[in-house]
Amino acid sequence: MSRPPPTGKMPGAPEAAAGDGAGAGRQRKLEALIRDPRSPINVESLLDGLNSLVLDLDFPALRKNKNIDNFLNRYEKIVKKIRGLQMKAEDYDVVKVIGRGAFGEVQLVRHKASQKVYAMKLLSKFEMIKRSDSAFFWEERDIMAFANSPWVVQLFCAFQDDRYLYMVMEYMPGGDLVNLMSNYDVPEKWAKFYTAEVVLALDAIHSMGLIHRDVKPDNMLLDKHGHLKLADFGTCMKMDETGMVHCDTAVGTPDYISPEVLKSQGGDGYYGRECDWWSVGVFLFEMLVGDTPFYADSLVGTYSKIMDHKNSLCFPEDTEISKHAKNLICAFLTDREVRLGRNGVEEIKSASFFKNDQWNWDNIRETAAPVVPELSSDIDSSNFDDIEDDKGDVETFPIPKAFVGNQLPFIGFTYFRENLLLSDSPPCRENDAIQTRKSEESQEIQKKLYALEEHLSSEVQAKEELEQKCKSINTRLEKTAKELEEEITFRKNVESTLRQLEREKALLQHKNAEYQRKADHEADKKRNLENDVNSLKDQLEDLKKRNQSSQISTEKVNQLQKQLDEANALLRTESDTAARLRKTQAESSKQIQQLESNNRDLQDKNCLLETAKLKLEKEFINLQSALESERRDRTHGSEIINDLQGRISGLEEDLKTGKTLLAKVELEKRQLQEKLTDLEKEKSNMEIDMTYQLKVIQQSLEQEEAEHKTTKARLADKNKIYESIEEAKSEAMKEMEKKLLEERSLKQKVENLLLEAEKRCSILDCDLKQSQQKLNELLKQKDVLNEDVRNLTLKIEQETQKRCLMQNDLKMQTQQVNTLKMSEKQIKQENNHLMEMKMNLEKQNAELRKERQDADGQMKELQDQLEAEQYFSTLYKTQVRELKEENEEKTKLCKELQQKKQDLQDERDSLAAQLEITLTKADSEQLARSIAEEQYSDLEKEKIMKELEIKEMMARHKQELTEKDATIASLEETNRTLTSDVANLANEKEELNNKLKDTQEQLSKLKDEEISAAAIKAQFEKQLLTERTLKTQAVNKLAEIMNRKEPVKRGSDTDVRRKEKENRKLHMELKSEREKLTQQMIKYQKELNEMQAQIAEESQIRIELQMTLDSKDSDIEQLRSQLQALHIGMDSSSIGSGPGDAEPDDGFPESRLEGWLSLPVRNNTKKFGWVKKYVIVSSKKILFYDSEQDKEQSNPYMVLDIDKLFHVRPVTQTDVYRADAKEIPRIFQILYANEGESKKEPEFPVEPVGEKSNYICHKGHEFIPTLYHFPTNCEACMKPLWHMFKPPPALECSRCHIKCHKDHMDKKEEIIAPCKVYYDISSAKNLLLLANSTEEQQKWVSRLVKKIPKKPPAPDPFARSSPRTSMKIQQNQSIRRPSRQLAPNKPS
C-alpha cells in the first residue's frame, strides 16, 4: 500500500531534499579539509591566520584606518582568549640550553602537565625575516611531523607567539656523533655500525622524495639506547620525477659538500641523491682517521681539495684502515657518474665492508649499540656541551607606520601530533545534561587511563633499563674476554721482540765499545793540539808585553786627552739641557697663567648658569603641581567611565543570559517538535497496521463462516465433530478480540501523549513571548546607556586635547633645561681638559729628566757589552774554522764510501752476467718443451670444436628461453592492466551507487579472468623452472667435458719427465745464487743505512750550528745598531738638537723588531691550537725561539731569510674560518720561498700537490671559484661579496688571497690588479702568525711589508735550502683523538 504524503510539506519538497544532500556533501568535504593536518586550511592554520592578522594590524598608525579599527574591535578580545587557551612556552619548564645557532636555540624542557621531557627548538621570527629567508623551517617541520620513521627525530607539536616559533621534539640524550668521536677512538667495528645506520636513515629520507644536502656528524643524534637518528632538515629539497634537484647555490657544510654541489654555485645546479652518499664517505673517513679527508684552514683550501679529490684524497700511514673500508670510502668519494649508491641503496648494502655476524640490515635497530649512554635521570644532559647564557638583548620587530605583514610567513606553522580539535564525532541530538555527564565520566576515565599509562611507561622504562644493563654487562664480558686473548697474543709478541732486542743490544754494546776507543783516540789528539795552542798563546803574550811597554806612555797621554774632551762634551750637553729646561719652564708657566685665567672665566659662567638653573627648577615645580591636579581630574573622570563601563558590562551579561535562555527554549522547542513528528509517524504507522490486521481478520472470518455454512449443509449427521470445531473457532475468536482490545488501549495511550506534548508546546510559547518582552526592555536600556557613554567620551576627548596642549608646553620647557645642562657639561669638560693638559706637561718635564739619567747609565752598560761581544766573536771564529776542518774530513770519508759502493755495484753486474748464461740454458730447454706443447695443442683443438658445438646448443636454448620470457612478460602486462581496471571500477563504485549491481557483475567477471590469468601464469612459471633445471644440467655437463683430461701418447711422456728433472736442477742452482746475492745486498744495504744515518746526524748538527750563527749575527747587529744610535745621540747632543727631533719607533730601532707571536700546532688550529714563540726580526733574518732562555743561549726554533719574503697580509674570516672569531683580527700571514726541505725530517705530513685543473689563471693569479657566507667585500669594486643563503659567485687567488666577483673575469674587466706573489707552489710556503692584540698585528704587518724585497727572489737551482726553515726534530705524534676507555657518562 502507498503511504499518503505528509500534510505540512510543499509540492517541491523532494528537489529541496536533493539540494540539501548535495550541500551536506560539500560541507563534509570542507570539514575534511579543515580536519586534515596536511591541509593548508586546517583548524590550526585558520587560527594562526586570525592571530597573525590581529598582531600585524594592532598598531596606532594602522588603527587610523576605520575598517582595520572595526576589525580589531571585533576580533581582538576573542584572539586574546584563543592565545590564552592555545599551547605556549609557559607550559614548559626550561631545564637547560643544549644548543645555540644563528636563528635561535634548543632547550631541554619538561612539560608541566604531563611531566614528560622534550627538546624544544626556538626560532626567532625577526632573525629569519632580517636574513631574507623564512622558508627553510617548513621542510624541517613537515619531515619531522609526517615522517613516521624510526630514523628521523619526531616532532610532537609546533606552536608560535609574536617573537618565536617553537618545535617540541623528542629528546635524544646520547648527544651527537661529534661528541662521541671526541670522547672515543672509533674502531672499524663501530664505524661499520654507525655508517650502516646513517645509510638506512638517508634511504628513509630519499624514499620520501627528498635530498638532505647537509649530512654531517653534528646532525646525527643518539637516543637513550645508543641508536642513531637524523636531525636538522632545513637544507632538504624535494626531488623531481627523475630523482634530481635544480639549485643555483652551494648548500651544506664546507668539509662535507660534494663537488657537483660546489659546481652548482652561480650556474645550473642539477644533481641527485648521490650528493648525500659523498657526505657519508667523508663521515666514514672522519670516524676512522679523526679528521675530514679534505681538511684545510681556509675555505679556498677545502674547496680546491674537494674539486681535485682524485689527487688530494689520501689515507694516513699511521692509522690502520682495512682494504674494504678504503674501497668503500673511495667508492663514495668519486665523481657522481660512478659514485656508489647512484643506482640505489642495494649497491651500498651489498658492499663487503658491512659483512658481519652480529647484525643485518633488517635487525640492526633491535641489536645493542656499540655505545649505550649511561644516564643518571631523564634530564641527564652530560652528552651535550655547556652553553653560556645569552645576555644580549633580544631584537624585535620595530613599530611599523604601514602594513608590513611580519607574521604572515608563519601562518600554518602550528601543529599537534594528537590533534584534539574537531576530533570528536558530530554531537548527537540528546539532552545537554546527558552529554555533560558522559563527558565528565569520559574525562575521569581518561585521567585514570593516563595515570595507568604513566605507571605502565615507568615500569616499561625500568624494564628496558634493566635489559640494557644486562646487555651492556654481556658486551663488557665479551670485550674483556677478547681483550684477554689479545693481551695473551700481545704478550707472546712482546716476548719474541724482547729476545730480538737483547740480541740487538749485544751487537750495539760491541759497536759502542769500538766507537768509545775511537773517541778516546780523538780526545788524545785534541788535548795535544790544545797544548800546542796554549804554548803559542804564551809566546804571543810575551811579544805583546814588550810592545805595550813602549806604547804605555803614548797611550796615557792619549787617554788623558780623551778624558778632557769627554768632560768638555759633557759640560756642553749639560749647559744645553739646562737652557732647554729653562725654555720649557718659561713656556709651561705661561700656559699655567693662561689656564688659570680660562678657569676664572669658566667659573663666572658656571655661576650664571646655576642661577638660571634655579629659576627653571622653580618653573618646573609649578608645572608639575599643575600636572598633578590635571591627573587627579583625569583619574576622577576615568573612575566615572569605569563605573559606566561596569554597568554596561552588567547589562551585556544580562543580555547574554537572556540570549542563552532563548537558545535553550528554542532547543527544547525543536526537540519537542521532533518528538511530535516522530510520534505522528508512529501513530500513522500504527493506524495502517491496525487497519491491515482488521481487514485480514475480517477476511478470515468471512472465509470461516462460508466454510461453516457448507459444512452444516453437507455434514448434518456429524454434529459432534462440528461442535468441537465450533469450540475451537470460538477460542480463536476470543484471542482475536483480546488482540483488538490491546491495540485500542495502545492507541489511547498515544493520543494521551500527543495531548501532553501540545500542552507543553503552549506553555513554551508563553515563555517565549515573555522572554521576547524582556529582551525588548533590555535593548531599550542599552540604547539609553549608549547615549550616556557617547556624551562621556566627548567630554574625555576635550580633556585629552587640553592635556596635550599642557604636555607640549612642558616639553618645550624641559628642552630648554636640557640645553642649559648640555652647555654646563661642555664648560666642565673644557675645564677638565685644561687641567689634564697642565698635569701632562708636568709629567713630561719629569720624564725628560729621568730619560737623561737612564741614557747615561745605558752608555756605560753598552760599552761593557761591546767589549765582551768582541771577545766572544773571536772565540766563535776559531770554533767555525775547526768545524770547517771537521766537515772536510767527513766529506773525504763520504767519497771513500761512494767508491766502495761502486765496487759492490761492479760485483753485482758480474753476477747478473752469470745469471744471463743460466737463463740461455733455460731457453734451450724451453724449446724442447714447446715441441711437446704443440702436440698438446692439437689435442686441445679437438676439444675446442666440441665446446663450440655445445655453445651452439646453449644459444638455441637461450633463444627458446627468451621467447618464453617474452610471453611471460606479455602475460604480466595483461595482469597489470586487469589490476588497474579493477582499481578504476572500485572508484566508479563509490561515485555511482545506483549502478552497483552492474559493477559487481563486471567485477566478478574480471575476478574470474584474473584467476584464469593466474593459472596460466602458474603454468608458465612451472615451465620456467623445468627450463632452468635443464639449463643447470647442461652447464654441469659442459664443466665435466672441460675438466676431463685427454689421454696423451706414452712415447712423449718420458722425454717430458727427463726435461722436467733438468729444469728442476736449474731452478735449484738459480735459487742458491739468488740467496747469495740477497745476503750480499742485505749486508751492503745495512752499511749504506748506517752511512746515511751518520750523514743525517752531521747535517742536523750543521743546520743547528748555522742557526746559532744566525742568532749570534742578529745579536751582533743589534749591538752595532745600539752603538750607532749612541754615537748619533752623542753627536746630536754636541751639536745641540731639540728634544722632539728624534722619534723612536715603538721602542725599537728601524732595523729590528721583536716580541711574542703564536704559530699553529701541526697546521691544525681547530684541534691542536696555537703555540707561543719569541720572534726577532733583524735586517736579514726572522728568528723564532721557544723561550727567552733559548734566545739567551742562541738556540732558535726556526730561521727564515727576509730576502725570500714574498707577501705579508692580515687574514680574513674565509682564510681561517675554523679559527675563533676573536682571534681573526690578530692573525696575519707570511708567504716565503722554500727551495728544498727534503733533508729535514718533516714535522707535519706534506700535502701532495695536485693538478691545477681547477685554477683560473689571470694576471699571475691562480683563482679558485668559491662562495662567501661570512661578511667580505670585493677587493676590485669594494661591493659586498657575501650573503647568508644566496651568495654571488666569487673568486679567490690561492697565492695572494685577493677576493673578487666572478663577473669581473667573465666580462673581462680590467679592474683586477696583477698578483703580488710570483712563485712556484713546489718551492713556496705560507705561515700563519697570531699576535697578542690587533695593534701588534698591524705593527708587525706594516714593519714586515717594508722589509719585503721589491723584486721577487729568483729560485736558486744550486741552493740546498734557501731560506732555511730549520725546525727542531720533535717526536712524531699521532693525529688521532685521545682514546677514552671509560663509559660515556662524562660532563659535557
From Swiss-Prot:
The modification Phosphoserine is found at S1137, S1362, S1374. PANTHER family: MYOTONIC DYSTROPHY S/T KINASE-RELATED, RHO-ASSOCIATED PROTEIN KINASE 2. Residues 979-1047 form the RhoBD domain. It comes from Rattus norvegicus. This is Rho-associated protein kinase 2. Changing W1170A: Increased activity and autophosphorylation. The keyword Nucleotide-binding applies. It is a peripheral membrane protein. Its EC number is 2.7.11.1. The record marks D1131, S1132 as: Cleavage. It comes from the Eukaryota. Residues 497-573 form the REM-1 domain. It is found in: Cytoplasm; Cell membrane; Nucleus; Cytoplasm, Cytoskeleton, Microtubule organizing center, Centrosome. Its cofactor is Mg(2+). SUPFAM superfamilies: Cysteine-rich domain, G protein-binding domain, PH domain-like, Protein kinase-like (PK-like). The keyword Secreted does not apply.
